[in-house]
Amino acid sequence: MNRKDLGELIIDIHKRKPSYGYHRIWKIIVEETGWVISANLVHKVCKILNIKSKAKHYKYKKPGEESVKYENIIGYNWNTSRPFEKVVSDTTSFWFKKKKSDWTFYLDVFNNEIVGSDVRETMYGNGILNHKKAVENMLNNKIKRGYKDQETIVHTDQGIIYSSVSFNNIFNSYKVTRSMSRAGTPTDNPVIESKNGWIKKEMYIDFDINNYNTVQEFINDIIWDNNNYRPSYALKYKTPIEYRTQLGFN
């Protein structure tokens, strides 16, 4: 391996994943080639080639007042020791072939893995069926992977659906405890806010949305990419599934 070969590979990965910074590019190079190189060398070559991530960090708003709907039992403690210990959720809206869609997804705090999801025509974040299918998908995955009898904290904002009695009744037959951010306080749920911000940018930077026939195919690729391909800084540049399987978890 010489710097010319390295530079060509960096350019190729940058074309595929324009949002990736040098750490993620380094991880992909190591995974795809087996080369023993440092992230610092990749950083130097990126600087020479003037290659930079096209994504920017997500900014948070200031905290608001305390909510009375569900107590924020997580507080600032986002530490976890296993999958499905703490799960967060949000809905993001985006345009697909001139139609707006709502994507509700559930993220496992343990390894940033998307463990539940549903996408359909927009109801401006208030689609009852969209939320119902997404949470059922998450709960089914929890059972399928062997965590049925393990307690799960599901943390969300105070959106209309997340606060509704009918939505929360879904959890009655499961070992789930609800937790909510304070009203108007995205900093109470930094994990999902950060992921949502990155996903919204990466879905347009790293994916050619016009190449997909359906919005479901598009979302399926984003989920696969997040869980199986995208190295995560918080996981020491391992992918979510790589991280949990190496620790021996289903």
Label each PLM-derived region with a short phrase.
Residues N168, N172-V176, W198-N250:
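C-terminal domain-tail junction helix/linker
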Residues M1-R82, T185, T239-L247:
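Basic, flexible linker segments flanking DNA-binding modules
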Residues Y76, T80-N126:
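An active-site-proximal beta-strand-loop segment
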Residues P63-E65, T156-Q158, S164-V165, R178-K201, ...:
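RNase H-like two-metal-ion nuclease catalytic core shared by retroviral integrases
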Residues E113-S117, R178-S181, I205-D206:
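Short small-residue beta-strand/loop micro-motif enriched in glycine and branched aliphatics
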Residues D118-K148:
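Active-site beta-loop-alpha junctions of metal-dependent nucleic acid enzymes
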